[in-house]
Amino acid sequence: MQNFFALIPAAGSGSRMGDRMPKQYLTLAGKPMIHHALATLCNSPRLSRVFVVLSPGDVEWARHDWSEFSSKLSMLECGGATRAETVLNGLKAAQEGTAIEDDDWVLVHDAARPCLGGKLLDKLMDELEEDEVGGLLAVPVADTLKRSDPTCRAERTEPREGLWQAQTPQMFRYRTLVNALSGAGGVTMTDDAGAIEALGLRPKLVVSDARNLKVTYPQDLALAELILKNCK
C-alpha cells in the first residue's frame, strides 16, 4: 500500500512582498500564513506525515506555537538556495528519519498558498492515486495573454488554448521526484512538475479552483483573508 506525505518548502525570502520578514510568517487571518496550509495538510487523515523545510538558522519558526500539529508535523532545517534545492534536500532528509518508500506519494505545496481546502486536496489524491506519473492542481488560463517587448509594449496576443496556470500541491512518487530534481542541475525550475517534464514524463493536470491562489504581492493578502473567511 502506498502512503501519502506532504512537503512544504519554506526557505524563501518573499522579496516581492516588500517585507523583511519571510512571507510565510506574515499574519493572515490572525495566524502566520503558513499555518493555514499546515492546518489543511495536517488535518488530512490520508497524509502520514507533513514536512516543512526551513532555511538553516530560521529564527521566526520558533516564535510561533505549532503544537496543534505535533502528531504529524516534522521540521527540517535544510533549505537550499533555490526552491528545487530546498525540495530535494527536504526529500532526502525526510527519508532518513521516516519510512518513506520509493513508490510513496509526496505532495509538494507552496507555503504561500494558504487557501487550499480539504476537498480540493482529496480531489488531487483521488485522481492521481493510480496514475503512472502523478500531476498537479491547475486552472485553465482564462485571461487574454500578451507578449511584450523590452519596453512593455504589446507585440502580439498569445493563443491561450491548451494553456494552464500551475498551482500546488504537485504530487509525484518519491523516487521519481528525487531523480527529476537531482537531474535538474543548474536549470532553474519554478515548480516540481517542470523537473518531471524534463524526464520526458507528462504530469496530469487536475482541475483546481482559482481560490487556491498564491500570495505574491501585498494586495494578495486581503483577497486571501476574504477567501479564508468565506470558507469557514
Swiss-Prot record:
Which reaction(s) are listed as its catalytic activity?
2-C-methyl-D-erythritol 4-phosphate + CTP + H(+) = 4-CDP-2-C-methyl-D-erythritol + diphosphate
- Which residue positions hold the site described Transition state stabilizer? 16, 23
If you read the UniProt record, what top EC class would you report for this enzyme, in one word?
transferase
Please give the pathway this protein is involved in.
Answer: Isoprenoid biosynthesis; isopentenyl diphosphate biosynthesis via DXP pathway; isopentenyl diphosphate from 1-deoxy-D-xylulose 5-phosphate: step 2/6
Keywords (A to Z) from UniProt: Isoprene biosynthesis, Nucleotidyltransferase, Transferase
Under Gene Ontology molecular function, one entry of this record is: 2-C-methyl-D-erythritol 4-phosphate cytidylyltransferase activity
Listed HAMAP family: IspD
Stated name of the protein: 2-C-methyl-D-erythritol 4-phosphate cytidylyltransferase
**What does UniProt list as this organism's lineage?**
Bacteria, Pseudomonadati, Pseudomonadota, Betaproteobacteria, Nitrosomonadales
